[in-house]
Amino acid sequence: MQLAAILHQYHDAFQAKYSVRLLPDHLPAIDAISRWRTPEAGQLLVQCSGCGHTEWHPRSCGHRSCPQCQNHDTTLWLDRQQEKLLPVEYFLATFTLPYELRFLAWDNQILVYNLLFACASKTLKDFGVNPKNLGADIGMTAVLHTHNRRLEYHPHVHAVVPGGGVDKARKQWKKKKSKYLFNEFALAKVFRTRFLEAATEAGLSLPDSVPSKWVVDCRHAGKGLSALKYLSRYLYRGVIGETNIVSNQDGKITFKYVESRTEKTRCRSLKGEDFLWLVLQHVLPKGFRRVRDYGFLHGNAKRLLHLVQLVLQVLIQAASRRLRPIFMCPMCQA
């Protein structure tokens, strides 16, 4: 079931109920997704190089919140990340903003999201350089998600961390010897302190009801590929796949999701306009970078990463350019 069709059907009810809550970046997203593969989005004239047959193809919208677009970009990102994988154990650390501060994130999205990235990455790097933990500079790939599996507003940062780091003083690689990275309760305590200090310095007014205990989840993630695939799902394609939209009946949209605690598939039904708000509230500010690399995985540290790969005897293959899918001619099958 296409999100564009749902947007067309419930557009008026959505605008009537949520227009006062829309942010400036929501409007271009609504416009782009509404025009997906319609004459308003334009068309491409395609000509077969074999028989010369021509036909028109409707264009996609290209918006990163559209579940139909950016498949190629998602694949390219995952290819680039796989080229950086090391033969070590990987870990997935998740830093979550507590419920009491989510209104602050909604009203100051760029600022708070940047603080989430900065405080989460700094916390992990400081734990890594601590001799009691690893005593080395670590690397990580961090991704911002603003939703939980029920699509509610739930800002958090995932960080995929290789189990090892670079000891710059000794010029050697130090490997994490167990399937345990850092103590998640200690991570949460330090992250809380740093975020609150940074938010105060940035001029944000904190509520009196800030919880004393925050949640950081840190777990083993195998060889890293499964965690990267999980994170890649929502980089360029919105927060819900259209195959998860189950039905559109009697003015209600039903979608399915996998419950995190039980891993069982559940369904949730809402009015059409409420479903649209649930999805569109996760549109990020224009130009905001949802994914960021740190440490020896940063784009400016390619030389260091290559040295690490050399030490770990990683076979570096020449990067092959993945081509976009080609059109098949209906006349000559070329």
Task: Place the predicted regions along the sequence by residue.
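Beta->alpha loop/short-helix hinge microenvironment recognizer with preference
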Residues: 1-334
